[in-house]
UniProtKB/Swiss-Prot annotation:
Tissue expression remark: Expressed at higher level in testis.
InterPro entries according to UniProt: Ig-like_fold, MSP_dom, PapD-like_sf, Sperm-specific_class_P
Superkingdom, taxonomy of origin: Eukaryota
PROSITE patterns (alphabetical): MSP
Species this chain originates from: Caenorhabditis elegans
Chain's gene name: ssp-32
Domain MSP: 1-107
The protein, known as: Sperm-specific class P protein 32
Region feature Disordered, mapped onto this chain: 1-20
């Protein structure tokens, strides 16, 4: 399982960025994929990646200028072998095991 801190973000309508930490509470390596309900106004880095067993990593959400609207980002995850090198592969194979949602607000 993966968790995200902080679990939400608020941006000005003029745009901005927010850094979040993905934490693995598993004894296994995890791959993740980030999806957005609004690809027009949000960008994330990285979109795909790995979190080592009991590890942490940071990712960034960038909001471009746009109208005030509530959105969400979903981080899907799947357990992967230690030697997996393609973070997209488990999702192409339908191996998703769970997801975490980040609520996004603008003001």
């Amino acid at each position: 399982m993966l968790t995200i801190e902080p679990p939400s973000a608020t941006f000005p309508a003029s745009g901005g960025s927010s850094t979040h930490t993905i934490t693995s509470v598993n004894e296994s390596r995890m791959a993740f994929k980030v999806k957005s309900s609004n690809n027009e106004h949000y960008r994330v880095r990285p979109v795909y990646g790995f979190v080592e067993a009991r590890g942490k990593m940071k990712f960034e959400i960038i909001r471009l200028e746009g109208p005030v609207k509530d959105d969400k980002i979903m981080l899907q995850y799947a357990e992967v072998p230690a030697d997996e090198t393609d973070a997209q592969a488990p999702f192409k194979a339908g191996a998703q095991q769970g997801d975490v949602t980040i609520l996004l607000k603008t003001n």
